[in-house]
Amino acid sequence: MDFIEISLIFREHLPLLELCSVIINLLLFLVFLFAVSARQILVCVRRGRDRLSKDDTVSASNLSLEREVNHVSVGFGFNLSLLCCLYVLGVQVLVLVYDGVKVRREVSDWFVLCFPASQSLAWFVLSFLVLHLKYKSSEKLPFLVRIWWFLAFSICLCTMYVDGRRLAIEGWSRCSSHVVANLAVTPALGFLCFLAWRGVSGIQVTRSSSDLQEPLLVEEEAACLKVTPYSTAGLVSLITLSWLDPLLSAGSKRPLELKDIPLLAPRDRAKSSYKVLKSNWKRCKSENPSKPPSLARAIMKSFWKEAACNAVFAGLNTLVSYVGPYLISYFVDYLGGKEIFPHEGYVLAGIFFTSKLIETVTTRQWYMGVDILGMHVRSALTAMVYRKGLKLSSIAKQNHTSGEIVNYMAVDVQRIGDYSWYLHDIWMLPMQIVLALAILYKSVGIAAVATLVATIISILVTIPLAKVQEDYQDKLMTAKDERMRKTSECLRNMRVLKLQAWEDRYRVRLEEMREEEYGWLRKALYSQAFVTFIFWSSPIFVAAVTFATSIFLGTQLTAGGVLSALATFRILQEPLRNFPDLVSMMAQTKVSLDRISGFLQEEELQEDATVVIPRGLSNIAIEIKDGVFCWDPFSSRPTLSGIQMKVEKGMRVAVCGTVGSGKSSFISCILGEIPKISGEVRICGTTGYVSQSAWIQSGNIEENILFGSPMEKTKYKNVIQACSLKKDIELFSHGDQTIIGERGINLSGGQKQRVQLARALYQDADIYLLDDPFSALDAHTGSDLFRDYILSALAEKTVVFVTHQVEFLPAADLILVLKEGRIIQSGKYDDLLQAGTDFKALVSAHHEAIEAMDIPSPSSEDSDENPIRDSLVLHNPKSDVFENDIETLAKEVQEGGSASDLKAIKEKKKKAKRSRKKQLVQEEERVKGKVSMKVYLSYMGAAYKGALIPLIILAQAAFQFLQIASNWWMAWANPQTEGDESKVDPTLLLIVYTALAFGSSVFIFVRAALVATFGLAAAQKLFLNMLRSVFRAPMSFFDSTPAGRILNRVSIDQSVVDLDIPFRLGGFASTTIQLCGIVAVMTNVTWQVFLLVVPVAVACFWMQKYYMASSRELVRIVSIQKSPIIHLFGESIAGAATIRGFGQEKRFIKRNLYLLDCFVRPFFCSIAAIEWLCLRMELLSTLVFAFCMVLLVSFPHGTIDPSMAGLAVTYGLNLNGRLSRWILSFCKLENKIISIERIYQYSQIVGEAPAIIEDFRPPSSWPATGTIELVDVKVRYAENLPTVLHGVSCVFPGGKKIGIVGRTGSGKSTLIQALFRLIEPTAGKITIDNIDISQIGLHDLRSRLGIIPQDPTLFEGTIRANLDPLEEHSDDKIWEALDKSQLGDVVRGKDLKLDSPVLENGDNWSVGQRQLVSLGRALLKQAKILVLDEATASVDTATDNLIQKIIRTEFEDCTVCTIAHRIPTVIDSDLVLVLSDGRVAEFDTPARLLEDKSSMFLKLVTEYSSRSTGIPEL
């Protein structure tokens, strides 16, 4: 080639560059005008909408009074950027004037003025935009400006390059005004390009605020008062996702918190989605009651508009994705010298660029849309499942345990939401096949029919796989449900497991359940590996069939046609790959839909079980006519039968009877909780319910008492007084703001009951239903509470109370005596005594117990003093619950306060925040910043010490090499144009291609199998490590950690590790190697591309780092915000009866919706951030592709091989997708790795002492005598909490019966926990038979001790398994224990005897029966030391007396420590320990203590005796 030809080339290219510049400037200018117009239209529309709806913004009551004072400082960078814009504008205006004069003088073509005119117009607009930034106080450069500056500099460099080559060839005589202008503006454009890369305008805005800006009455500390900018974003902002810039900017400077994340737009909130789905679900149920309703249909009806909008983007994206494959043959022909029209190459390059640009934008909008659609579906379904959980009938609860329902929310709902990604594949697959066939028909002719046949065969092959995967998924989910159910049960009852030394046994059971789950997981993952093989093999099979058919038919294959076909196959690969995934996902989604649909169709509580009449319309408060009720409607024996009762307004009704007589069921029938077989129940007014097993919410004491009602200080103070809580609250370190642990773990049994009573009293109901609330209280507190609460505070209310305290019965207006589910006696106290029979037997047993106590009269001089009460009055002014709180103070300020008052609010809020740090339950720990490399290494080393990682990379590299080799072979071997001969024999061509391509698919199968093997081993190891760590955790961990947090890790996080992370890791390796292959192919043809790839890669890494700073924190917040949803659900299910009893369902549903929004807020920003990054990645890669195309077109014909250039274009079509997918796969991998990080946290819990210490194992006969010695024992629950036991010292002689008494909260149960080492003493020591228990293993200690705990616990299973979980005893021994514990006849009356079922939490057994089962366990264990912690509180006096006799007989030679509020239970003990405020007040024989007139024990006995003589003396 000579200089003349080169000169002609550059003469052609320079005008084209100028033409490109003109077109780009005009396009950007039009976009600018369109954006401005669209923004104005959107503003007008929103103004009109705002007038019609108040819902689109946060209400004024929720907004702060903030008036920000913005201080704007203009930096040197801004001034220089404005100066550069004006400078370039001036230069272009000069060029325009010069060229205009020249044209006029020389009478030239006016077309030459287009370039300087467009440049002048563009830089005028740019100067205006930059100047406008100052008035907008914008710290960030608009995306449009940044793109404009970047393109201007790029075109300038290209023009300078062409100008330089031309001047070198033709000489300086050809120098023009444009050349001079380019040289003049290059430094300015370079600086502007640098600013475009940084994105900073040079303007700094300092926002300051006065005290008047402090938000008032913000309920949640984590609340944000700003609605997401997404709701008001303009068209350009929506397309470019620049509305997210402020959040990402904040995240790049500091770790994001929930308060940084804006509120959702009203249309995106859970409430909106829930209402729509709920309405359509009801409609589907009512349309055809005879057929099961379709949940899928209800979902489609609810969200079809969003799906249709997504379909538009999906369809457009599909169309433009086939533009490249269609044009490749033309491009190869052009490079081969076949030019159809002038400048065809540039036109083709422009079309390629435009199509990829449209594909990029539509892809991001499409993916963003499906994410939002899935988000709405998940929110709505979660809310539906929660609501259903509150309404479940007793029968339905047996079919769905809380663990299973957690799985519905955590796994099934997630899967249904994820199906939005596959929703459009159903109709897109045929569309893509049709487009592919059209292109193939152009390329290979009639052989395209073979493509269709091969495609159909490939699809049919996947159908059996889908069925197999559906079965595997169904079995996997069933196994996961079972594991979650047992895990949830173990976490709830961990205290019992540790006390009984059963934790290893139950942990092994969980490991066995995991093994079963692991088996199905292994099958699912290996089947997925086979699906991956099918995915990569299908296009190879289709291509081989197509090419073989073409060769057989004699169709001429050309390089262009082959490359077009290969590009088409590569695109067709996606729907072919997605089809197995689609079928698999449809199968999985169907399973999840069926599970949730079945749950939503479960029977709810009978709405007509109780007829509620508004207050004031009747004098009859409660009326039951011919009531027959049964927990199991299919049972032949009803729970309650023949119930007749009429209670007038204001009456006090007492319900009594022996254990299992139906007392609690009687309360349930009034509430409508128990299924009604026949009869009628009517109540007049509202109800307040206090359950027998206290239900306490996590939160502070005030929140538990208010229970959603507004604070009224006087009323609140009276309630505290009436419930005897004032002294307790004063003793708490934070008063009524003390955080209560899960299930009230840091409260004593009596305190929990009094909080329950306070909650009921504060609601001011008309009817109060109290299920034995006094059993957990000592005599004095019980007497005071009965007097102040029932006789005084509820004097004008209707009260129905269940009680075993016979002494309270005389105060009742009506007494009901139940036996075997029937009311056998009813009437007043005296009338029933005279009638004799069962009621007289109950009362007589009580009086006999009282008469057995020989009680001297206390001296009159001490009668008005109470040393125990005085010792408890340790007033803490900081915990005064009656001072004005933050809300009251804020209200006063709103009514006319000053700034100083607001400062007081701020200070008080700061103090409250500081005080929370000392609470028992803390906010969930969250790692901040970059995921530690230690986490990655721990995961990669978890399976075979990382030995599989190199093999996975090697297999992927081999696959990629063979893929490129097969495509290169087809491009090289086929002729460039029709008529030319092929370089090889057609048969050899096909054999080599098939061998290379099939070999690549084999390697991908090897990679997929290795990834599955690696993932399985790593997941199993991580799970077992976490499980063992959790089970070895001290009890303080469970006290301070809500079960929802742990369940979140063993369900959601573990599912991510099981099913997601292995493929994420493999996908990242795959994408990395594929990207390297694409770049290698492109640079092999046009090495100049590498010069642009390097800066683009740097820019990508910078953006990835910028994005990850916010993304990882958003993912962590998402994970943390999921726990409260699960926790609330578990808590609500446990207290559903209480919630319904107070009619609080709507409030709890609203709370659930709020928590869902708190979860969705960071999730929404997280998915938007992903699309934000992908958009910018793909735009950069599209520019690289465009640059490659321009270079290929610029080369003279014959310079490069058209076949290789076509191959480079074929791979370049995938560059934008692969580059963004590479960065995205790493980002998603890091986001998913956070699940491993969270599991790793729980694998590193500091465990309690070893279970067995081989060097200090006690003798097998230990303890021989059972002597317990406490030496200066001090105990506290946590380092940040006060001491509970203050130097307790005493000796319990072996074989003696020790009674432990004291006021509620005096430290009795804490002492027992120290004995079992659930809490390790901070000082002192405890010895048993002269062996320091701190020196031996926990299992050796706890397995040698027996206990009947205060809260009786039954595990789901059978009676046999609950009595003998370790399977150490024969049936005869078990029956003997049941008979001695008074349960033998009850169990014999069951159809399955010892195999009689026990439901979750033992719900089908009464509380009293559960305590008797605990007694049976102790009888079987026959430990030398037995502890009874309020073991008989929930049984009647006669049964209690009988149990005490059994214990005295069966444990005659054992040391028995009894904690009891019933004085007769401990009066015959050998020694009595009186505790007061965590100290030993008295310790002696009962006789000596009763002889001492100043004895605290004497006062306790006297109080009990006085109370037991009857209510009139109270």
From Swiss-Prot:
Cellular component aspect of the GO annotation: plant-type vacuole; vacuolar membrane; vacuole
Reactions performed catalytically: ATP + H2O + xenobioticSide 1 = ADP + phosphate + xenobioticSide 2
Means of activity regulation: (E(2)17G) transport activity in negatively regulated by organic anions such as oestradiol-3-sulfate, luteolin-7-O-diglucuronide-4'-O-glucuronide, glycocholate, vanadate and the sulfonylurea glibenclamide, and, to a lower extent, by bafilomycin A1, NH(4)Cl, GSH, GSSG and DNB-GS.
Outcome of gene disruption: Increased water use efficiency. Low phytic acid levels in seed tissue.
Boundaries of every ABC transmembrane type-1 domain copy: 307-588, 949-1231
One GO process term, biological-process aspect: intracellular potassium ion homeostasis
Residues that bind ATP 1: 657-664
Cellular localization per UniProt: Membrane
Transmembrane segments: 16-36, 76-96, 111-131, 142-162, 177-197, 312-332, 334-354, 421-441, 446-466, 533-553, 946-966, 986-1006, 1078-1098, 1117-1137, 1155-1175, 1180-1200
Main enzyme class: translocase
Organs and tissues of expression: Ubiquitous, mostly in vascular tissues and epidermis, including guard cells.
Chain segments annotated as coiled-coil in the UniProt record: 899-927
Name of the protein in question: ABC transporter C family member 5
Organism field: Arabidopsis thaliana (Mouse-ear cress)
